[in-house]
């Protein structure tokens, strides 16, 4: 038991050392880049496996990376070194499939030989020379084989259904071409339609585009035959009731009154054969006249049916246009009245302004009376100005002297 425990610890240490070498050998700009959380987790397991429980001081707050590493290491508590090594190897096993195979990876795979093997990829060896490590599962190979076998059987059944469907499509096209030459309507087989719908329901989603194209072909053929049926007469059904009118010359006009549908009444022959609007009679001139009359009568009924709705629509449109024209006329008349009122007010204002200008006297800033001038005074200035000019120096001198005397007395 002791020897087995030592062997287990040695194998765990060997795997741990190989895993550490793989992590350290990863390139910084490689195809797979470890996240920060994964790096912190590997760091905590590595420190726990190499140094034991965390007993160091907590880093400063300005070192968030060191703080995260310390907290992850501290959270492991008293985990043993062997358990930390095992956890480290288990974490790297989760991402080993995404790592490139190198020499360090080969050492790790040798240590994990009971669980993994190297699978060489021939296509990648020519370009990169690097292969991936894939896990071996004993039960997965049988499941893959069963899945592949089921896919092959399903694909074969789908191909067979598609072939049957294409044959039905070709038959339908041939049938439509032959019936079109004979001038009769295309009768769609309901059983074939059901079989085609069942086949399309069972096919794979990748065949949807083919089914859509074939459905468009059927829709196009149906539309063509519907348009032909409007121009050509339909075959009269048994028991539908055929009214015949015998003319004076012996010709017969048949009107097929069909019930239970949305189609217009069709003209048919008396003998029930699809031979046009009128059955052939031995009088060609009269036949042509009757055919033209019948066609004109049918077209007249259609125009009459369409004309009722058209006249109603035209009457409603005409009434709407008349109402709009009436509103526009009313608005224009009101606008004209408002403009005339504004012009009338402007004319009155101009007249009032002109009358006020005529009544008010004009103001002048100049005095009407001229200044009186002394005849005996020779100067242009007044005598008072001249006396003041002569006496003001004496007055100033006297004031200065008086001020000085008062100052001396003090």
Swiss-Prot record:
The keyword Coiled coil applies. An acyl-CoA binds at residues 23-32, 43-47, 69, 88. Gene3D superfamilies: 1.20.80.10. Pfam families: ACBP. SUPFAM superfamilies: Acyl-CoA binding protein. GO terms for biological process: fatty acid metabolic process. This is Acyl-CoA-binding domain-containing protein 5-B. The gene is acbd5b.
């Amino acid at each position: 038991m002791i020897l087995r425990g030592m062997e287990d610890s040695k194998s765990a240490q060997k795997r741990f050392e190989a895993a550490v070498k793989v992590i350290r050998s990863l390139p910084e700009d490689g195809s797979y880049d470890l996240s920060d959380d994964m790096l912190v987790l590997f760091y905590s397991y590595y420190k726990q496996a190499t140094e034991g429980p965390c007993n160091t001081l907590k880093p400063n707050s300005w070192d968030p990376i060191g703080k995260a590493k310390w907290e992850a290491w501290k959270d492991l508590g008293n985990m043993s070194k062997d358990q930390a090594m095992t956890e480290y190897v288990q974490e790297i096993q989760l991402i080993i499939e995404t790592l490139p195979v190198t020499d360090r990876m080969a050492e790790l795979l040798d240590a994990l030989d009971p669980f993994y093997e190297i699978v060489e990829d021939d296509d990648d060896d020519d370009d990169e020379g690097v292969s991936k490590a894939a896990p071996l599962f004993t039960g997965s190979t049988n499941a893959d084989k069963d899945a592949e076998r089921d896919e092959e059987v399903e694909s074969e059944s789908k191909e067979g259904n598609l072939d049957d469907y294409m044959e039905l499509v070709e038959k339908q096209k041939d049938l439509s071409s032959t019936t079109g030459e004979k001038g009769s309507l295309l009768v769609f087989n309901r059983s074939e339609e059901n079989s085609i719908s069942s086949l399309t329901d069972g096919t794979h989603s990748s065949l949807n585009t083919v089914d859509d194209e074939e459905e468009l072909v059927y829709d196009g053929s149906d539309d063509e035959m519907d348009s032909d049926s409007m121009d050509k007469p339909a075959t009269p059904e048994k028991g539908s009731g055929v009214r015949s009118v015998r003319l004076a010359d012996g010709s017969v006009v048949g009107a097929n009154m069909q019930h239970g549908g949305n189609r217009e009444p069709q003209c048919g022959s008396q003998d029930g054969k699809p031979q046009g609007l009128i059955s052939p009679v031995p009088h060609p001139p009269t036949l042509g006249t009757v055919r033209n009359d019948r066609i004109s009568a049918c077209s007249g009924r259609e125009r009459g049916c369409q004309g009722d709705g058209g006249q109603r629509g035209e009457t409603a449109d005409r009434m709407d246009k008349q109402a709009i024209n009436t509103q526009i006329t009313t608005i224009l008349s009101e606008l004209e009245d408002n403009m005339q009122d504004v012009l009338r007010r402007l004319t009155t204002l101009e007249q009032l302004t002109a009358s006020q200008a005529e009544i008010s006297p004009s103001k002048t800033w100049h005095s009407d009376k001229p200044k009186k001038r002394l005849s005996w005074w020779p100067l242009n200035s007044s005598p008072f100005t001249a006396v003041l000019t002569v006496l003001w120096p004496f007055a100033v001198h006297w004031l200065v002297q008086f001020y000085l005397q008062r100052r001396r007395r003090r």
